[in-house]
UniProtKB/Swiss-Prot annotation:
GO terms for cellular component: ribonucleoprotein complex; ribosome. Part of the 30S ribosomal subunit. Interacts with proteins S7 and S18. Binds to IF-3. InterPro entries: Ribosomal_uS11, Ribosomal_uS11_bac-type, Ribosomal_uS11_CS, Ribosomal_uS11_sf. Belongs to the universal ribosomal protein uS11 family. This is Small ribosomal subunit protein uS11. GO terms for biological process: translation. One of its GO terms (molecular function) is rRNA binding. Located on the platform of the 30S subunit, it bridges several disparate RNA helices of the 16S rRNA. Forms part of the Shine-Dalgarno cleft in the 70S ribosome. Signal peptide: none annotated. Keywords: Ribonucleoprotein, Ribosomal protein, RNA-binding, rRNA-binding. It comes from Pseudoalteromonas atlantica (strain T6c / ATCC BAA-1087).
Length: 130
């Protein structure tokens, strides 16, 4: 039986983006780093859990640093130079993720804290008794 002719397609070139935004969601259990363009379309993302850390090691500053490095290197294919950073959450990976993006060669133009603060909304969880 003859093989069907395969259609040759060229790989589409990645679009070039000069300025972007980095969204860092630092919870107590994990850190999610998403790098987007100016319109908010995701270019790359990485998490502490997806970077090989499991359990309580996900919530360490080093895990957040590794996640930010992975997201930063994946976004370099788009030609990003400048980043505006938005940090959300009280987690331990806030500062180290920003430092890792800076060390990856990005010029950080602005850092904004967008942590949602309730105006006396839902009742918070009870305090832990260890």
């Amino acid at each position: 039986m003859a093989k069907a002719p395969t259609k040759s397609t060229r790989k589409r070139a990645k679009r070039q983006v000069a300025d972007g935004m980095a969204h860092i969601h630092a919870s107590f259990n994990n850190t999610i780093v998403t790098i987007t363009d100016r319109q908010g379309n995701a270019l790359s993302w990485a998490t502490s859990g997806g970077s090989g850390f499991r359990g309580s090691r996900k919530s360490t500053p080093f895990a957040a640093q590794v996640a930010a490095e992975r997201a930063g290197t994946a976004a370099q294919d788009y030609g990003l130079k400048n980043l505006e950073v938005f940090v959300k959450g009280p987690g331990p990976g806030r500062e180290s993720a920003i430092r890792a993006l800076n060390a990856a060669g990005y010029k950080i133009t602005n850092i904004t804290d967008v942590t949602p603060i309730p105006h006396n909304g839902c009742r918070p969880p009870k305090k832990r008794r260890v």
